[in-house]
Amino acid sequence: LNLSNKKALVYDLGLFTENALRLLRDCASVEYYVPTREAFPAPYKVEIGSGLDGLERVDSFEEHLDRADFIFVPDTQCAAMVEWLRGHGYPVAGAGAAERLELDRWHGRTRQKENGLPVQETHRIKGVTALRKFCADRKDFYIKVDNNFRGISESFKHQDLRASESRIDYIAHKAGPYKEDVVFVCEELLPGVEPGLDGITWEGELLYPTTIGYESKGSGIISRVYGSERELPEAARLIDEGLAPEFKRHKTRFFYSAEFKIDKDRVPYLIDSTIRLAAPGVAAIQSELIENYTEVVYGLATGEKTAPVMKHKYALAISMDSSEASKTFVNITFPKEMRRWVKLRMAVRHRGDYYSVPPFDSLASVISLGESVREVVETAKERIAQVEAINLNIDFAGIEKLQEEIQEGKRYGINF
């Protein structure tokens, strides 16, 4: 498929600049929009993507709609817009209404149960007062902030009230007068390993090849390619089948990820649904592992089903952070020939140099492709050694632990 005369328009919230840039490898142009409507806009979001290797940063989304051959919306919080665009005949690739499975966790758990997936013990708690009581009475739960307050706190493990109280105090402070309106989804802590299915759904049909990955937040992700349904571990197939009715109902054609826990009983429990590109590692890997990436995105937008092409068996993304990046622009340097393998997060290019955009401490992921776990790990380490930034933090120990988790997962039926 020749897309060299096509124009792409990307509506992003700032995290998927590299995926927008990947389209430029095959398209005539890529216009990149990040919403910045604020009374007193800071220079940060206004600059994301500017000067970045041919990407054209635009200040208006609506003015460019009718010039685009297809539209790409990689993130969530955009369901109404994506559905409106579809309803008005625009070719758009985005999660749409199905994103509620991710954003409304209680809804997601409810649909999961209705679709026949096993469900761990789960409680819906409203307000910090009720949460304190729950935490005083219960131990060993994973607590997630739900509804419109997700941004005020990361999910956290609750073992006893003494350990969790400071986090609850923090949430109460951040929520202010709304502290009794915050909804929490409290889920039983489960034993076992936590792989994730990272795929593309076509209205409930999982497109092959697809991948499963083991991820450690702040460290990275190791992924393995599966060429067919027969090759895919049964646990991952069951998870996909449990989500498929939702994708079919919403006519979802997009990327998604589903993390699940599995132990020696080999029963998969869905932990998190990500109905968008999964950041940072999965999206970074997909942009290079999928050789016909632009064709796939174009097909998702236009209704032309296009199977992804993957010529490698394994992939790895290692995360790079810097404490300085949350405070100021951080210069990131690497050899020119490394550009394809360094996937920046919120970034700009100014006067020939690459910078991360504050206040986000995640700088980039360095990726590698290969035919064994050992190969992708060694290649990624060689590449990371060539990247420089102030206060650069890389968790190699986390990558080693992932390799141990892969071996454990094999005992539970996750062939890797």
Which residues fall in each region the model found?
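ATP-binding N-terminal substructure of ATP-dependent carboxylate-amine bond-forming enzymes
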Residues: 1-97
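Short glycine-rich anion-binding loops that position phosphate/pyrophosphate groups of nucleotides
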Residues: 16, 76-78, 146-148, 276, ...
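Hydrophobic anchor at the start of a short beta-strand
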Residues: 28-31, 92, 119-120, 141, ...
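A conserved helix-loop-beta module that forms one wall/lid of the active-site cleft
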Residues: 94-177, 183, 321
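Internal nucleotide-binding/catalytic subdomain
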Residues: 154-278
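Active-site "cap" helix and flanking loop/linker of ATP-utilizing ligase/carboxylase catalytic domains
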Residues: 235-257, 274-339
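Peripheral (often C-terminal) accessory segments that flank ATP-dependent C-N-forming ligase machineries
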Residues: 297-416
